[in-house]
Amino acid sequence: YEVPLRLVGSEMCIRDRERSFEEEVKLSGFGAAPVKAEGASISYDNAQESFTARYNHETVAMGFSITEEAMEDNLYDSLSARYTKALARAMAYTKQVKAASLLNTGFTTFNSGDGATLFSTAHNTVQGGSNSNRPAANADLNETSLEQAVIDIAAFTDERDLLIAARPRKLIVPPALMFVATRLLQTDLRVGTADNDINALNTNGSIPEGYVVNHYLTDADAFFLTTDVPNGMKHFVRTAMQTSMDGDFDTGNVRYKARERYSFGVSDPLGMYGSPGV
């Protein structure tokens, strides 16, 4: 089988790092600037720390060996090439699964730095408000739910409850929804109706980067949107994949291994929007 296509990075920032872990602090910024009366003193505001997102790097490693007898029987070249490709595929698969795990567990067990699950109706702000990056009621992917997602994202505020005019960027769907996504985003007229209405999602360019299929999503009716809010989902690379080989004196086998260190996480949950479906 071929090495999986590179999906890591389609919905997250990728950064190289040199520490055992990473921490990113979200700052509150300032409130709305007030009007200053003539001759009056200027008003001052204090920025605050909202929450801290922590990324703990994991080491992922795997290896294989070729026996001395296989090398004697001139099987080394064919086996080495095939096993090396299989090892690369195994390493890539683990990375894709770990990246998708943020989405797969984002409604249940994976928490963002503010203590709420990644997709929550209660991402509280330091000013006392809250943001919701999931629908109030679980919804399947259709015209109504996608339009509501665009509206919900537009209502995002910063930590001081100021509107940030957020917009969706890309729709992420499992294979089971790829055809639904095509009809919703790439047709000129509305789908599933005899009315001659335009497809507002398409005409308005509401999802400017279209959609991508993520084969590692485990829920067949969940869908997700990336937004233009910076510092959302991130992938930190502590050590890029390294390969090495050596011979074992006792057995005569030749051993190969691959190893890398990385982490996945979310610095700002407003970088994503998701619905688990019904």
Where are these regions (language model features)?
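Sequence/fold signature of self-assembling virion shell proteins
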Residues: 119-158, 165-170, 176-278
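Solvent-exposed alpha-helices and their adjacent loops that cap or buttress functional pockets
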Residues: 56, 163-165
